[in-house]
């Protein structure tokens, strides 16, 4: 074993080249490692110190930058504040300056310029309107017109159906339509407003009423109020009367029994100007003065007064009055219905009914036209024709309705609807039933009355609701009707539905034999007087305005009130 170890030691101690190799001991190797570890540790320490120094330097520099940044931001804020304050001050000064200028212009400059321009335009228009050929142009300077689709109801157009036959329906019952009423009233407790007259033209309407300041006596001094306006639709899409201009005529002129016509952009009013009471007037020869008033939409008014000698009368009259209800406009003339007493009675046979009446003859009917209470004068209806009504001085001609065509002369109304003229007269005599028909104004003048059995009016005991036999009497009340069908067989009206008393005003839609649909205004005891009904269409749908003199019983005075209904027309399907 020892020999082998000596051989092994000899091998490791000699190099292959034969030189001797010195072996490194374990202690020597350990010393070198420690040296390198020491060097590495020192290097790490040095790097750490350098890193700390670098961080300190960087931090110092950053602190300086932050301080400079803060100072810069503060300086910018200060500068921004100064600029803001400067701009605000400048803007405030500019705004104040401009506001002062605007205020000055609005309060002073613009009104002055507008007034000047308005005066210039008005002067130019008035200068132009003085020329005859520009009259129509000047009339149209104010654009006032009914709402689109609204027109006076024309029976030939209304009373038809796309299929089937038209008829008045009882279901549902008519009801009052909501909306305002702007009819003129009184400012005194005892004031009385009478004789409403309404005319609806193609563009505007005219409404007139008589205001007596104390009580309701006809001869009492009174104002006459004439309104012009147009028909609009309210928020419920129902029609309303909207007055545009109103004129009140002097109380000292004492206009009475006025009738109106609306045509173009003007309203025309024909009135009597009595100086005595009615009975005294009938007992004397000649008539009281008439006056024609003209009002336009600018509020300008003109009046023409006519004495008995200035009127072309076809017969001598002791009394003559416009008929309260509306008149009509035709080519170049206005026509008002009137009534009055002839100085000398006409000869001929009047409208009469003998069948079913005891001890009655034609003479009974003829004599019934001569009213004892009015001095025995024969009371007739007339047409009052105002010719050349656009001229400086219109002319008036009076034509008597032949007694052969008429009942007792009385208040009434004319309507021109389409090509036909309709006439209504108050049933003041023995004939109590509704008097409405078609008037032919050509020569000879004729009336085709439509017999109505269902509608009548209250009257005195001898001539009450049911009376149909001839006798002398003067009674009744003005309750006109509006024709819905071309033959005036179907009508809209407000009747005082009572036998002898002026009570129970009731809106009625009726044909010749039956009351189809009706609405009582309040109750059977409500007192009323004159009523007038006018109807329109809105794109074919029919509506009626009803104006009723209602007795304000707590004040014992009359005041017209406006009501509106929808026409209950339906179409019967063909079988």
From Swiss-Prot:
Listed EC numbers: 3.2.1.18
Keywords tagged on the record: Disulfide bond, Glycoprotein, Hemagglutinin, Host cell membrane, Host membrane, Host-virus interaction, Hydrolase, Membrane, Signal-anchor, Transmembrane, Transmembrane helix, Viral attachment to host cell, Viral envelope protein, Virion, Virus entry into host cell
GO BP terms in the entry: symbiont entry into host cell; virion attachment to host cell
Region (Involved in neuraminidase activity): 254-259
Virion surface-side segments: 59-575
InterPro entries to which the protein is assigned, alphabetical: Hemagglutn-neuramid, Hemagglutn/HN, Sialidase_sf
Record's bilayer topology term: Single-pass type II membrane protein
Keyword Signal carried by entry: no
Mutagenesis or variant effect for residue 462 to G: In strain: Isolate E30cl2, Isolate E50cl9 and Isolate E30M15cl5; egg passage attenuated
Membrane-spanning intervals of the chain: 38-58
Region annotated Involved in interaction with F protein, chain positions: 59-140
Protein name: Hemagglutinin-neuraminidase
Source species taxonomy: Viruses, Riboviria, Orthornavirae, Negarnaviricota, Haploviricotina
